[in-house]
Structure formats: C-alpha cells, structure tokens
Amino acid sequence: MSEPLAPVRGIQIEIPGSTNLALTDLLIDFTGTLSLDGLLLPGVPEALIHLASTLRITVATADTFRRASEALQGLPLEVRLVDCGEQKARIVDELGAEHVVAVGNGRNDVAMFEAAALGIAVLGPEGAAGVLLQVADVVVPDVYVALELLLHPRRLKATLRA
C-alpha cells in the first residue's frame, strides 16, 4: 500500500502583517491535482518524495478513475478514500488544522480549504472549480508550482503578506 511515514521537519513561514504558519502536513487531492485521467502527472512522484522529508503527505481522493492507490503505491504518503468534501475537512481536523496545507482543484476541496491553515488551489489541465478559488489563499497554474512553493516556502511570503 504505502511506505511508512517518517518524522518530518515541517515548514515555518513568517508572514508580515498576518498569522505565521507552522505546517507539518500536506493534504492533497488526487484527481485533477496530482493526476490527469487517473494517471500521475510526470515528475509528481519525485516531487512528493522530495517533499516527504519536510511534510507528512496524505492524499484524500474520491478516486474518480479508481487508479489512485495503484498510482501512488510505494510513495512515502498515506492514501485516504473519501466520498465527499466534508470527509476531507474531517481529515484536516484529525491532522491538526492549524498545521495543514491543503492542495486541490475541485468543488469537493472547498471544506478542506476552509478548515486548513493554508489552501493552495491548482488550475491544472482539468481546471479548477470557481467556488474553490474564492476560499483559496493562493492560486497556482499547476501542481508543480504548488509543490515548489512548499519546497521553497519563502516564495509564499510575498503572496501572503498583509
């Protein structure tokens, strides 16, 4: 299924004029965020492996194409199957909402974004739900930029400062 999760360093982000962030967990959607038509986007596994030394990674997915578990097998993350957006929000709460960064693109990610300390909406090849953009803290063109922001968190300072 998935590899054992190792201890993480976390990400500290000092945001001038706003609340500082102390992130330990990434909760990320699969369909349309990490994948296209149920297949992982090129380069995503390597980025997730790199990021796993900094954040614990949980993939929460309705698994529209029924390929998530197979596609993510062997990566240092946990896969959680969900039926609705409220279940994603409950996972945020389980992880400790004040320490969670959420990444997604769909309508069923809205509650997850509202519960998380930081929400990054991904436009990507499948687009993004308009309602999600209204609750996102940051909007990026694709998952690669989202993961790069977490690998280089100082880049978030300018976007999030008050």
Enumerate the language-model features and the residues they cover.
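Non-catalytic pre-domain segments flanking phosphatase-related domains
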Residues: M1-I28, A162
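Short amphipathic alpha-helical segments, especially helix-boundary/capping motifs
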Residues: A6-V8, L21-D25, P42-E46, F65-A68, ...
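Weak global preference for isoleucine
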Residues: I11-I15, I28, I49, I57, ...
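Short, acidic loop-to-helix structural element flanking the phosphoryl-transfer center
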Residues: E14-I15, N20, D37-L55
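Asp-based phosphoryl-transfer active-site loop
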Residues: T19-G38, F113
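C-terminal cap/substrate-recognition subdomain and adjoining C-terminal extension
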Residues: R56, D63-A162
